[in-house]
Amino acid sequence: MQSHQLTHLRSLLLFKTLQTALSRQSGVFLGMECHAFTVADLTAINTEVVTNCDANHKPISSILYAADLSATSDLTTLTNLNTLTAKKVSAVIGQDGAGLGYYLWKGTTKSITSLGATLGAVSFAAVSDSIEWVGKFNFSNGTELDTPAFANGDLVSAKAQSYLDALDSARYIFLRKFVGNSGTYVNNSYTAIISTSDYSFIENNRTIDKAIRGVYSSVLPALGSPLVLNADGTLTDTTIAYFTSLAEVNLTQMVRDVELSAFQVLISPTQDVLSTGELTIAVELLPIGVARSIVVNIGFVTALS
């Protein structure tokens, strides 16, 4: 069997296993298989997740992908991920530059990547957390990942800011340092989709998937239940209140846990449930914001206002 066929088989088996385990976030690492990084993998993984997991009420919110970049000398030549529609997948291109990860890289000449640490951060984070949160997600223990590199072996410190900006704009996840801070952090929590999408960050996908799971589990017991109508054929206030309360219960807990800012459940009383047998419930979510940049204007004045 050809190596690419083996990889495809492993991927299919992986996702069948993930479906069974109901994993919420996972990683796909192909670096040690000498499998070169390709954006086609991102699309294929996303299709598998959306088709076989999300569509069957088993949503996987985040798949981190890393593959071999040892032969890619200039990472800015990688495809801009804004051109993809793989909202459930993120591309990790970071790597350790001086610790154990570095020695594994030197010994194998294949990308080791920082996928494991990134997956750990996503798993530790609340669904609304961005893993770029400096105060919460230090990726280094003082030794490993203390010297950030890229998965082709290049040190982050050796690259111009314009190079880093290009990779950031292309929506890749990599390691970085801050002046005056000893930790190592990631640049952002991007997914492989255009930046204007509602699902362009890992935390957005995790938040809405948790809301979907919560509403599904709380409303499911009412499937097949009676829908009481007024004399004019509209839904009664009691019926609307009942289904609204079902949809709200887990969303209310998410607000308490600071995973949502607010939400609204809307049920039209005029929908024709007698003809369709279908009750439509609209749920609007107001997410938690993320301080992706902080601008401080500071200067001298002649007097304080």
For the regions a protein language model found, what residue spans apply to each?
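Catalytic cores of large soluble enzymes that bind and process phosphate-bearing ligands
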Residues: 10, 41, 73, 203, ...
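Intrinsically disordered, low-complexity boundary segments flanking structured domains
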Residues: 15-19, 158-164, 170-173, 249-255
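Extracellular Cys-Trp
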Residues: 1-143
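Compositionally biased, low-complexity/repeat regions
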Residues: 4-6, 260, 265-305
